[in-house]
Every structure is written in C-alpha cells, then in structure tokens.
C-alpha cells in the first residue's frame, strides 16, 4: 500500500474512533466555534436518555426549584467526548462514569438529569452565566478554578502521554519532549503543565524545564477538543498527545494497534471536582445537596460500582471533603 493510501486509511480509522465516542450527528457534524475573548460558547443541548444507575429508594436532599436552571432537572455542563468519563453511546446519548455519577446524584435529589455539551475552556463561564447547575467534566481542582467556583472532590487522575504504536519519537521521559510537538486540549491542567500556568506557575512547567536546560522548547499544539488532539497524533501532526490518565488508557485499550502509553511517565495525581457556583454566604443549597448525595453514593457502594463499570475504579475517592 502506498503512502497516500496509508494516510487515507489512518484518517478513516481515527474518524471511526471519534465517531464511536460521539455518534450523535446533531451534535458532531458542525464544529463548535471558538469563542472570542470574553464570550461564552452557547452550550449545545444533547439527548438525556442515557443509561442511568438503578433508582434509589430515598431522596437524600432537595434543591429549591427557583435555584435550578430548569425546574425538576439537574442541568450538567460537560465537555463531550472525553471517554471513558463522558462520551456518546451508539444511540447518541451521553454516557460515561461522570455522566452516570451525575445521573445518580440527580436521582437522589428527586430530579432528572439534563446535559449541556459545553466547550471546556468556556465551561466555568457557562456555569456562572446560568447555562447549567453544576459541571461534571473531569475538571482538576486547582487554585485558579477555586477562585471562581466551589468544587466537590469526586475522582482523582494522573496525566499521561499517548504515542503512536512503537513510540517512533522515542519519548520515555519529560526531557524527551524538548523540541517535539505535543497535542493538548485548551483549558486543561495538562495545558497548564506544559505552559507553566495555573498551579504550575511556580515551577514554570515542562516547557520552561526544557529551555532552562538549554534545550529546544516544546512545540505545544493546543486544540479546542480533546478528540482533536488525538486526531493530530493519529495523523502524525504531533509526536504525543497529553491527557488525563483514564482517557489515555481508554484510547490505548480500544485501539492497541494504533496507540500506546509512554510507560512509567504518569504525572501529577490530582483530584477532580464537581463545580458549583459560590454561595453568597457559605455553600449554596445546590452545593450542599450535591455533596450529600455524592457522599451517600460513596458510603453505600454505588459510586464504586459506577467507576468499576468503566474500569476507572483506581481513581476512587472516599470522601467529598477537600
């Protein structure tokens, strides 16, 4: 097979991969526009008939209707796809460990779940702008986010590097990133880690480590969607793709003939949080109720069952306290 045919086959393969995670044509055929500074991208409504955990027998908390975006519903902002935590099933419904957790929280508050698919780097602005009640979207807890919202710990994950099968650029350590291209989603902690932003301001991040040592800078390639960064790796536009460990592991497990993890190079185990708007004087009713519902799930084992369903139980937490 000649090189042009190989490239075409590769592109078709990755298209099938991404489609398997986001198969709803209504959501995926038109790319989301990049918001201009100061603007919030309008969240895209997605179907909400996703499989949910079995109904609970009792409601553990309530939220006044006038505090909800839509009465009777817990509206969740999430950046889809980001499997296995949030993605679309074959029928175009949102699913994943984060989505199932959100559904069960809503259930325990006597509510139905609604999902708004929202660009990740505008997701906090969407919450603060009244587009949703909470965010469940694999958000790492950091100081910059805590200055804007309150966050309830619900998971923990590291950061991993995915490379093409055979690791053609021989990336084994962070030093090997110097002078190479790295694909990453905008607004993520991984992007901060590369650029020396957020919680990595003090150390300067991975790029500064290269330049301070007299080595070539990392060629950081930011993408609006995590799936775009994966596509860049598949089409050889970047040497590696930097993302949360559960997401990296998912893609490698699903397509072991195309991708592999950089063994032994998992960085920064960080807790992820459910984001809620800050209350005017202490925690809001939404924060208190969501926290109570989540802790009840942890205590009765439902939470761990959900994580185990998606093979991410290694990221389980035992408490909703920081």
What annotation goes with each model-predicted range?
Residues 23-31:
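Bacterial lipoprotein signal-peptidase II cleavage site
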Residues 30-32, 41-93, 169-171, 175-181, ...:
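Immediate post-signal peptide segment of exported/extracytoplasmic ligand-binding proteins
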Residues 54, 99-108, 165-168, 175-189, ...:
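Extended ligand-binding regions for polar small-molecule ligands
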Residues 57-138:
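Extracytoplasmic small-molecule ligand-binding "clamshell" domains
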Residues 80, 155-163, 214, 249, ...:
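Periplasmic-binding protein-like
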Residues 103-108, 116-117, 121-134, 148-149, ...:
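Short helices/loops that flank or line small-molecule/ion binding pockets
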Residues 111-112, 119-122, 139-140, 152-204, ...:
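A conserved helix-loop-strand patch within extracytoplasmic ligand-binding domains
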Residues 121, 139-146, 194-197, 234-269:
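A ligand-binding cleft/hinge motif common to bilobed small-molecule-binding domains
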């Amino acid at each position: 097979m000649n090189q042009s045919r190989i490239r075409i086959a590769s592109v078709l393969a990755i298209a099938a991969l991404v489609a398997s995670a986001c198969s709803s044509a209504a959501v995926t055929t038109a790319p989301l526009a990049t918001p201009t500074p100061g603007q919030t991208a309008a969240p895209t409504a997605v179907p909400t008939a996703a499989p949910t955990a079995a109904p609970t027998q009792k409601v553990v908390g309530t939220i006044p209707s006038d505090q909800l975006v839509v009465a009777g519903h817990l509206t969740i902002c999430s950046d889809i796809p980001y499997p296995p935590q949030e993605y679309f099933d074959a029928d175009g419904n949102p699913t994943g460990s984060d989505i199932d957790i959100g559904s069960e929280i809503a259930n325990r508050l006597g509510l139905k779940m609604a999902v708004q698919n929202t660009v990740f780097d505008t997701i906090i602005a969407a919450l603060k702008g009244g587009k949703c009640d909470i965010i469940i979207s694999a958000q790492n807890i950091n100081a910059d986010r805590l200055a804007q919202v309150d966050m309830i710990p619900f998971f923990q994950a590291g950061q991993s590097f995915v490379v093409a099968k055979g690791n053609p650029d021989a990336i084994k350590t962070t030093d090997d990133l110097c002078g190479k291209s790295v694909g990453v989603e905008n607004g993520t902690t991984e992007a901060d880690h590369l650029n020396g932003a957020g919680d990595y301001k003090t150390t300067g991040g991975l790029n500064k480590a290269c330049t301070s040592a007299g080595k070539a800078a990392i060629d950081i390639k930011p993408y609006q969607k995590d799936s775009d960064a994966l596509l860049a790796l598949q089409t050889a536009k970047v040497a590696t793709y930097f993302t949360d460990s559960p997401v990296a592991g998912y893609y490698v497990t699903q397509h072991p003939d195309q991708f592999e993890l950089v063994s032994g190079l998992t960085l920064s185990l960080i807790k992820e949080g459910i984001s809620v708007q800050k209350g005017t004087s202490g925690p809001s009713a939404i924060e208190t109720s969501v926290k109570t519902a989540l802790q009840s799930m942890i205590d009765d084992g439902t939470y761990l069952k959900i994580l185990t369903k998606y093979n991410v139980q290694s990221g389980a937490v035992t408490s909703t306290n920081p």
